[in-house]
Every structure is written in C-alpha cells, then in structure tokens.
Amino acid sequence: MPAQLIDGNALAKQIRSEAAQRAARLTERGHQPGLAVVLVGEDPASQVYVRNKVKACEDNGFHSSLDRYPADLSEADLLARIDELNRDPRIHGILVQLPLPKHIDSHKVLEAIAPEKDVDGFHVANAGALMTGAPLFRPCTPYGCMKMLESIQYPLRGARAVVVGASNIVGKPMAMLLLQGGATVTICNSKTRDIGAHTRDADVVVAAVGKRNLITADMVKPGAVVIDVGMNRDDHGKLCGDVDFAGVREVAGYITPVPGGVGPMTITMLLINTLEAAERAAG
C-alpha cells in the first residue's frame, strides 16, 4: 500500500489559523507582530521566497516591511540597516534572505541581528542554546519537520533517525531536535561512503541535500517516515525534492511531497517564531 502523505499545506493552514488568532489578540493590546524582511540583489528564487513570506504575514494579521537593495549594497550599509531594525519596537523578527552577494559576509550579518529578533534561528546565541534544548527560536525548516512528525503522532523515543545533509540551516539543527525528541540520530554528509547502509535501518529519514532523486526506494526501510526537505527542478522544470517520490512512496509508511510538504511549513514556523518574539516583547 502506498505511503500516507503528510500534507504540509493542510497542516500549515491549521497552524496559521491559530497564529492569526494569537496575532489578533496581541494587536488588540497594541502589539501587532512585526517581521522585517531584507533582500539584497535580484536572485529570482529569493524574490519568490520573500514574496511568499510577506504575503503570509499580511494574510495572518502581521505587520511586515520589505527592504529591497541592489546587489552592490555595501556590507556597512546593510549592517547599519540591521542596527536600525534591532532598535525598532514595531519589529519583532528580522529575516535577511540568503544567499547574500559575495562581497557581504553573511556570518557577520546574521550575527548582527539581535538574538531576540533572530526568527530564523541562525544567530550563534540561538544555535548554541539549541544544544541545551532551550533556544529562543528553532530554525524554521527543522521546526516545521518536527511539527509534521508531531502531526502523525510519531513516537520518536527510541526510533532510529537518519538526517542526510549536515548544513547549519537544516541538517545539524534537525539532528539536534530529533535527538531531543528521544531518537537515536545519524547524520550523513558529502563524505559518507554508503548513505543507503544508514538509511535502510532508519525509522525516520530526513533528506536535506539539494540533489534530485538522491534517496531511492531501495534505500528505505518498509514503513519508514520520509521527510523531503530538498527543493530541486527536474528535466522539465518541475519542482521536486531529494527523494524519488514515486518509488519511495511504494515502500515508506509516510512521506512528504514536493511541493506541498516542508515548504509551507517553513514559512509557517517563521510566523510562529515572529509571534513568539512579539509575545515576549509584549510581556
């Protein structure tokens, strides 16, 4: 029997509805949640992501601001703008869309964001606090993946989980959240010799590499949960993930689609992080 789909769109809609109600209550008290988005350059994919984030804010009662800058913006000017946003009481979350132009040090920029407004969860203070299990914010994509596991009431305690991909944005924080959930976690990276040797034993597989069809049916244990974080395009320009969806769906117990899986949840958890920042600021 084909795997059950974990519908990211449906789950995102439910969580956003609850977030909108919380945002409305805050707004009544004079504390409308506010997200500032900063875009440098003309990267087409970044423009789409930014547009979706701003629209999600508007649709759910959040205040949003969008700063667009040309690709030749200086690092000093960008840092000065972040400093202004750090001091703006109307702004509770600051998101700098990555990637940045090569002449700008993205690490320096992310570290300039006040930790209490770091709704992406990338600041070293939040990344470090994630290790102790008490971050102000969890990175949005791993947070969304955990919510998807929660939605199917998956018993993580004692489960074997394999995260394919070791980025600071997804792979590493994903592994930490799974570990905190009680799973036994393995991280595969670009140097891993035989990824399938690890994934075939896994109860949960999270694919987050950015390589089409990396995870195939013969690499998945029957009944496993497969979460596809990848965002690629096939030969026809159609969106696809890191998982061979058609093949793996015949083996797995649960699977997330691309599109309509992790993507909507990432933006949703950005709203939740911004909302929680606003609630903390409101007291």
From Swiss-Prot:
GO terms for biological process: L-histidine biosynthetic process; methionine biosynthetic process; purine nucleotide biosynthetic process; tetrahydrofolate interconversion. GO terms for molecular function: methenyltetrahydrofolate cyclohydrolase activity; methylenetetrahydrofolate dehydrogenase (NADP+) activity. One of its GO terms (cellular component) is cytosol. Its EC number is 1.5.1.5, 3.5.4.9. InterPro entries: Aminoacid_DH-like_N_sf, NAD(P)-bd_dom_sf, THF_DH/CycHdrlase, THF_DH/CycHdrlase_cat_dom, THF_DH/CycHdrlase_CS, THF_DH/CycHdrlase_NAD-bd_dom. It catalyses: (6R)-5,10-methylene-5,6,7,8-tetrahydrofolate + NADP(+) = (6R)-5,10-methenyltetrahydrofolate + NADPH; (6R)-5,10-methenyltetrahydrofolate + H2O = (6R)-10-formyltetrahydrofolate + H(+). Keywords: Amino-acid biosynthesis, Histidine biosynthesis, Hydrolase, Methionine biosynthesis, Multifunctional enzyme, NADP, One-carbon metabolism, Oxidoreductase, Purine biosynthesis. The keyword Cytoplasm does not apply. PROSITE patterns: THF_DHG_CYH_1, THF_DHG_CYH_2. The keyword Magnesium does not apply. CDD domains: NAD_bind_m-THF_DH_Cyclohyd. Pathway: One-carbon metabolism; tetrahydrofolate interconversion. NADP(+) binds at G165, A166, S167, S190. Homodimer. Catalyzes the oxidation of 5,10-methylenetetrahydrofolate to 5,10-methenyltetrahydrofolate and then the hydrolysis of 5,10-methenyltetrahydrofolate to 10-formyltetrahydrofolate. Belongs to the tetrahydrofolate dehydrogenase/cyclohydrolase family. This is Bifunctional protein FolD. It comes from Cupriavidus taiwanensis (strain DSM 17343 / BCRC 17206 / CCUG 44338 / CIP 107171 / LMG 19424 / R1). The lineage of its organism: Bacteria, Pseudomonadati, Pseudomonadota, Betaproteobacteria, Burkholderiales. The gene is folD.
